Amino acid sequence: MPHPPSAALSLPRNGFTLKRFFVAHDRCEMKVGTDSIMLGAWLPLRGDERHILDIGSGSGVLALMMAQRSTAQVDGVEIEPGAATQGQENFLASPWPTRLTMHTLSLQAFSAGCGRRYDLIVSNPPYFAPGVACRTAARATARYTDSLDHAALLRHAAELSCEDGRLALVLPVEAAESVVSKGMTHGWHLLRRTAVRDRADKPVRRTLLLFGRIPAAVQSNTLDIRDDSSEYSCIFRNMTKDFYLFF
């Protein structure tokens, strides 16, 4: 992620400072990273969103980005209590405390008890299949799909979505095709796909996906984070300039 120049002002060290809000993440197993910032900046908003849901919210960075970009009520759902508490603290410290709410429970429990339907659902979901043990149970919950596999995410997102709702995800490239295929099973039609590379001469490492309940022509493109001189590319800068402090 972009770092401040050496002569820049001193910033808090327990989180990440963006242009309009600060995200404390020292009590969250998964820290603020480029993937969430990309997803929150990349996805196109229609402008009429009333309710937005961030699944696996963690520190709340995606929910906060949605609050900055819209006038919607934004809910986060996070199963890990420590992360959920810090996410709620971040919400309360933001410019939009009345529009942000964190729910501390599993997506399965949230979906079963939620009477609301969402215009937009966003998620940077767990991405590793269960394997090598993590240092803590909280980190395993944040990283491994056994706590929330992609099929369950797609199914519950469909249950929580409006009839014309949309779902935006960021995934490792190796998981993207499977999620697109599984999405069709749950009525999610791919609308937009962006392949993300560190640089033009590097392999694709992440995929940004936008699904809708209503089918439409698929838009596909590629995003290079850095240019040939290893500086942040103009496209990446323009996409994230409302958030990154030093763009």
Swiss-Prot record:
Catalytic activity, as annotated: adenosine(37) in tRNA1(Val) + S-adenosyl-L-methionine = N(6)-methyladenosine(37) in tRNA1(Val) + S-adenosyl-L-homocysteine + H(+)
GO terms under cellular component: cytoplasm
Enzyme class: transferase
Keyword Transferase: yes
Gene Ontology molecular function, alphabetical: nucleic acid binding; tRNA (adenine-N6)-methyltransferase activity
BP GO terms, sorted: methylation; tRNA processing
Compartment(s) of residence: Cytoplasm
Keyword S-adenosyl-L-methionine: yes
Pfam family, one: MTS
EC number(s) stated in the UniProt entry for this protein: 2.1.1.223
UniProt KW keywords: Cytoplasm, Methyltransferase, S-adenosyl-L-methionine, Transferase, tRNA processing
Family: Belongs to the methyltransferase superfamily. tRNA (adenine-N(6)-)-methyltransferase family.
Function in brief: Specifically methylates the adenine in position 37 of tRNA(1)(Val) (anticodon cmo5UAC).
Name the record gives this protein: tRNA1(Val) (adenine(37)-N6)-methyltransferase
